[in-house]
UniProtKB/Swiss-Prot annotation:
Self-association and partners: Part of the 50S ribosomal subunit; part of the 5S rRNA/L5/L18/L25 subcomplex. Contacts the 5S rRNA. Binds to the 5S rRNA independently of L5 and L18.
GO cellular component: cytosolic large ribosomal subunit
A Pfam entry, by short name: Ribosomal_TL5_C
The keyword Ribosomal protein is annotated on this UniProt entry: yes
Presence of keyword Ribosomal protein: yes
Protein origin, superkingdom: Bacteria
UniProt-recorded name of the protein: Large ribosomal subunit protein bL25
Disulfide bonds: none
Record's function text: This is one of the proteins that binds to the 5S RNA in the ribosome where it forms part of the central protuberance.
Example GO molecular function: 5S rRNA binding
Single GO BP term: translation
Keywords (A to Z) from UniProt: Ribonucleoprotein, Ribosomal protein, RNA-binding, rRNA-binding
Database matches in InterPro entries: Rbsml_bL25/Gln-tRNA_synth_N, Ribosomal_bL25/Gln-tRNA_synth, Ribosomal_bL25_b-dom, Ribosomal_bL25_C, Ribosomal_bL25_long, Ribosomal_L25_dom, Ribosomal_uL5_bac-type
Organism: Hydrogenovibrio crunogenus (strain DSM 25203 / XCL-2)
């Protein structure tokens, strides 16, 4: 289900205008993509902070932005935070139409770690990648990709090509047609005796 956020159109741009917005409890943002010009908007910072704390999958979800003209479906493309305070300073949204492909990093959720034969034999599980870059339609964008490691033996790796992906989702690393990009995702080291 898509979350609906309220935004307002920004008329002033630049460092000073953005600073005034932040002091007023708002976050400057921009919506870009598609065949439409970029649109500068502002959102309430407490609304964004609350939503991100409650739903960490928002980074890979389609959001609806209302109040700045027509309602637009978007994904969060970039979110910038202040280095000392952690407050959100700017957000980039990319328009997400049903016909346009989006490319986004998606987290991997590893399942069955404790029941893996390699771990039961005393092997150590190593995670080489915890996120992967996928390309798909916005409506097919997964919030996470489940990786079953319950059958992984000691001394073996699970590679990108062995991941089970949702329908319509492709790994960008494998679209090159070269097996050099088929990297290991997770592996279990052999037991030393």
């Amino acid at each position: 289900m898509s979350q609906v956020w309220t935004a307002e159109l920004r008329t002033e741009e630049g460092k000073g205008a953005s600073r005034r917005l932040r002091h007023a409890g708002k976050v400057p943002a921009i919506i870009y993509g598609g065949d439409v010009d970029a649109k500068s908007i502002a959102l309430k910072s407490n609304q964004i902070e609350r939503a991100l704390k409650l739903d960490v999958d928002l980074y890979n979800s389609v959001l609806t932005l209302e109040g700045a003209g027509d309602a637009e479906n978007c994904i969060i493309k970039d979110l910038q935070r202040h280095p000392a305070t952690g407050f959100i300073t700017h957000i980039d949204f990319q328009r997400a139409s049903d016909k346009a492909m989006v490319t986004k990093r998606v987290p991997l959720k590893f399942k069955g770690k404790e029941s893996s034969p390699g771990v039961k034999m005393g092997g150590l599980m190593s995670f080489m990648q915890t996120t992967v870059e996928v390309s798909c339609l916005a409506k097919d964008l997964p919030t996470a990709i489940d990786v079953d490691v319950s059958e992984l033996e000691a001394g073996t790796n699970l590679r990108l090509s062995q991941l089970t992906l949702p329908k319509g989702v492709k790994l960008t690393a494998l679209t090159h047609g070269n097996t050099d990009y088929d990297q290991a995702v997770v592996g279990i080291s052999k037991v030393k005796r």
